[in-house]
Amino acid sequence: MSQVNMRDMLKAGVHFGHQTRYWNPKMGKYIFGARNKIHIINLEKTLPMFNDALAFVERLAQGKNKIMFVGTKRSAGKIVAEQAARCGSPYVDHRWLGGMLTNYKTIRASIKRLRDLETQAEDGTFAKLTKKEALMRSRDLEKLDRSLGGIKDMGGLPDALFVIDVDHERIAITEANKLGIPVIGVVDTNSSPEGVDFVIPGNDDAIRAIELYMTSMADAVIRGRNNVAGGTEVYAEEAAAPAAE
């Protein structure tokens, strides 16, 4: 199993939290101190927690389970889409639609509509329509692809969520909690770790930090899939153990 090291995290700026006045007391135990009114995250705590999360993801992937990557804010979306595509994982990079997990039956119907429109665009159906109707369907296709393109091949609910910025993606976390889906999350000093099974205390804004998290997670998925072992549906119970206090 490949692990992230302290130097990687320092270079990426994982240790830089938010301004001290915005801190969340629930993250106090992960804060080393403050510099220029910015909280500094204790990487000696982050390092083992990050590597535990990577090990969990690798074992999930080894059991042929699906890990959904979620990062919809501007600094995260592009990186999330690129790394999820690299490891063949479902992802949400634009906007979390309410009910994406808890109302998956409706989401699945929208995915079917997306696939139908993709087929029509490819087989020449659009060319046979009036210009107005073709334009309407093209716009519908574009809208659906932006919202659901990352999960159209998921084929069912994911077995875990990896979330960048737990405050920004709180609806996704709440839905996962309701369904008992384990959540791995990057939690900054201004956020609450509640509802997150595998907390990664760290900077959730810096692009280099987000690249480190996403690249490492994608690598863990690839390693797991390259070392498939018997396909056991494991680790939902394991996720309950390290839950945030």
Curated annotation (Swiss-Prot):
<dbReference type="GO" id="GO:0003735">
    <property type="term" value="F:structural constituent of ribosome"/>
</dbReference>
<dbReference type="InterPro" id="IPR018130">
    <property type="entry name" value="Ribosomal_uS2_CS"/>
</dbReference>
<dbReference type="InterPro" id="IPR023591">
    <property type="entry name" value="Ribosomal_uS2_flav_dom_sf"/>
</dbReference>
<keyword id="KW-0687">Ribonucleoprotein</keyword>
<dbReference type="InterPro" id="IPR005706">
    <property type="entry name" value="Ribosomal_uS2_bac/mit/plastid"/>
</dbReference>
<keyword id="KW-0689">Ribosomal protein</keyword>
<comment type="similarity">
    <text>Belongs to the universal ribosomal protein uS2 family.</text>
</comment>
<dbReference type="GO" id="GO:0022627">
    <property type="term" value="C:cytosolic small ribosomal subunit"/>
</dbReference>
<dbReference type="GO" id="GO:0006412">
    <property type="term" value="P:translation"/>
</dbReference>
<protein>
    <recommendedName>
        <fullName>Small ribosomal subunit protein uS2</fullName>
    </recommendedName>
</protein>
<dbReference type="InterPro" id="IPR001865">
    <property type="entry name" value="Ribosomal_uS2"/>
</dbReference>
<dbReference type="Pfam" id="PF00318">
    <property type="entry name" value="Ribosomal_S2"/>
</dbReference>
